[in-house]
């Protein structure tokens, strides 16, 4: 129950950040289109800082075992959920924004603050493992889907700053190389912008929307149901059947981090990618807002379900 309360408090805090972005545009200080600059800063600067900084921890065999367990759970979920969402998209005739909003969770923006507040800073690394796995899918499948490109540009994927950051973080961890303290502090400071910056962008986009149309759009509620209820339930079933929880003494806590990453609202990165690649960013933002709003109720309930089932 305590974890559920902490979740509600954290999500409420994110909503206040969205409100700030909304007010900035409504008062005329900035325009909605100005959010594109912030989006690029988040995608190409803030997220890489978060990833590299997260891997700056002491190397131990136990740590490696825990990381591999979380990695296995993350890949397992991403692969199975991708197949499930792809099938649902075909049957339900969902467009690119809808399928990516259902599949991609807001782990990039939420998992770090959520894990920090709920479990402690020392557990953030494991959240970043899931985030890194999702990042690979996001910049391959996600980017290809949203941009409607027929082929993957492997050079852009391999040399993408986010992919490079994942590789750099892993290499630094396994080679036991620690960056100078001033560098780590800088990475940590910049990385702390991830939640506020992403939520402010969402608020700025909302300011130019017809909010009435968002709440009257039945399709948005349906997409939110798939993102916040169906995906988490399927994920919980997969984690339970996999038996991964029995591999480690802290298995339940480690898998909770993975589960927390899965049950978050739709990824705000989808909105940012839609802006960059010319898709429907306003619709993506509407789904993000609705799922974030409803997640105040669904996330605590899903955590309670996890604690009961696992």
PLM features: residue spans?
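Alpha-helical transmembrane segments of multi-pass small-molecule/ion transporters
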Residues: 1-310
């Amino acid at each position: 129950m305590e974890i559920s309360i902490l979740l509600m408090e954290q999500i409420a805090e994110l909503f206040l950040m969205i409100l700030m972005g909304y007010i900035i545009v409504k008062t005329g200080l900035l325009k909605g289109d100005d959010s594109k600059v912030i989006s690029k800063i988040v995608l190409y600067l803030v997220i890489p800082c978060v990833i590299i900084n997260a891997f700056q921890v002491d190397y131990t065999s136990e740590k490696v075992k825990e990381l591999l367990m979380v990695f296995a759970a993350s890949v397992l979920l991403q692969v199975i959920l991708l197949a499930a969402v792809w099938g649902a998209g075909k049957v339900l005739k969902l467009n690119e924004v809808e399928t990516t909003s259902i599949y991609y969770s807001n782990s990039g923006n939420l998992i770090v603050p959520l894990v920090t507040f709920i479990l402690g800073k020392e557990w953030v690394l494991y959240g970043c493992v899931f985030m890194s796995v999702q990042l690979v899918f996001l910049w391959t499948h996600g980017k290809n889907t949203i941009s409607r490109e027929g082929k993957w540009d492997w050079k852009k994927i391999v040399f993408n700053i986010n992919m490079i950051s994942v590789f750099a973080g892993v290499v630094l961890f396994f080679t036991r190389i620690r960056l100078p303290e001033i560098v780590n502090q800088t990475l940590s400071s910049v990385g702390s912008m991830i939640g506020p910056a992403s939520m402010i962008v969402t608020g700025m986009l909302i300011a130019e929307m017809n909010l009435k149309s968002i709440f009257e759009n039945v399709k948005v509620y349906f997409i939110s149901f798939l993102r916040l209820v169906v995906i988490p339930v399927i994920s919980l079933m997969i984690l339970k059947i996999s038996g991964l929880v029995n591999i480690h003494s802290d298995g339940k806590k480690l898998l909770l981090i993975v589960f927390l990453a899965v049950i978050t609202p739709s990824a705000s990165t989808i909105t940012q990618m839609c802006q960059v690649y010319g898709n429907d960013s306003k619709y993506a933002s509407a789904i993000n807002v609705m799922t974030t709003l409803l997640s105040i109720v669904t996330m605590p309930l899903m955590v309670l379900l996890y604690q009961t089932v696992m």
